[in-house]
């Protein structure tokens, strides 16, 4: 009898461990991470042409360390990368008589004119985090006529590979952070919600161009059901 009870206990423990592990693996497989535009031209660290405040060495280090934590927890990590041709329509230098941050109409929409940034195959376009962290890097902004703040599509509606990659991994929830809160993080998070994903945005792993527009962007995200966490907290992420 004791032998039989012992075997029963062993099997119970076995199934608890195995099934519990499978459940954890399933949870990990259903959540992905999108790290938005951690590139030289957007950072103070590299004296980028479009550097955002707060993007110093400490920020890059913290972002890399937290991304490693997520990878070690079993979550697939995807990066977005601005990847513009030299003649991109969003560069003020490609519009005679225009200055940086002027606003023009482009294809019927307001277009902010930016300093030249993240030009293909230049150091400013390089991702500053360890490339081995990423399962895939999704390039955006390659069409010279359309800007692409979102990691899912450009302003003309042309899709990137992001949605396809996430669906291939059966992901239904994404954690989003990076540069900039009020532009590419915002657009990527909102498009993720529109595509049917649950979204969590990490505030302290993101940096915005301006405090007022960053707050407005976060308010907009919250209104769409996006959960905003101040810090990366694996337990809170699993619970949302």
Name every feature range the model reports, one short phrase each:
Residues 1-11:
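Bacterial N-terminal signal peptides that target proteins for export
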Residues 6, 20-21:
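Residue-identity detector for glycine
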Residues 11-20:
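Bacterial N-terminal signal peptides
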Residues 23-141, 168, 172, 193-200, ...:
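Active-site acidic carboxylates
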Residues 90-91, 148-151, 187, 212:
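Short, well-ordered secondary-structure micro-motifs
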Residues 131-166:
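Histidine/lysine/aspartate-rich catalytic loop segments that bind and position anionic ligands
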Residues 156-162, 182-195:
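Short, composition-biased local secondary-structure segments
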Residues 171-187, 201-206:
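Glycine-rich anion-binding loop/nest that anchors nucleotide
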């Amino acid at each position: 009898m004791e032998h039989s009870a012992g075997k029963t206990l062993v099997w119970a423990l076995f199934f608890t461990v195995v099934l519990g592990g499978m459940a954890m693996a399933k949870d990990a497989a259903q959540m992905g991470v999108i790290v938005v535009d951690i590139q030289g031209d957007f950072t103070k660290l590299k004296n980028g042409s479009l550097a955002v405040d707060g993007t110093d060495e400490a920020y890059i280090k913290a972002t890399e360390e937290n991304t490693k934590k997520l990878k070690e927890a079993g979550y697939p990590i995807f990066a977005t990368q601005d990847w513009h041709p030299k003649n991109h329509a969003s560069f003020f230098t490609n519009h005679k008589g225009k200055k940086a941050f002027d606003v023009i109409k482009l294809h019927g929409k307001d277009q902010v004119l930016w300093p030249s940034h993240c030009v293909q195959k230049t150091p400013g376009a390089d991702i500053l985090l360890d490339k081995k962290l990423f399962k895939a890097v999704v390039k955006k902004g390659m069409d010279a006529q359309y800007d692409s703040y979102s990691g899912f599509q450009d302003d003309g509606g042309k899709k990137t590979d992001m949605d396809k990659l996430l669906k291939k991994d059966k992901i239904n929830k994404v954690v989003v952070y990076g540069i900039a809160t009020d532009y590419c993080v915002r657009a990527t998070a909102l498009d993720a919600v529109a595509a049917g994903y649950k979204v969590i945005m990490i505030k302290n792993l993101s940096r915005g161009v301006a405090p007022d527009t960053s707050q407005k962007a976060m308010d907009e995200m919250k209104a769409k059901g996006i959960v905003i966490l101040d810090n990366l907290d694996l337990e809170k992420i699993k619970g949302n």
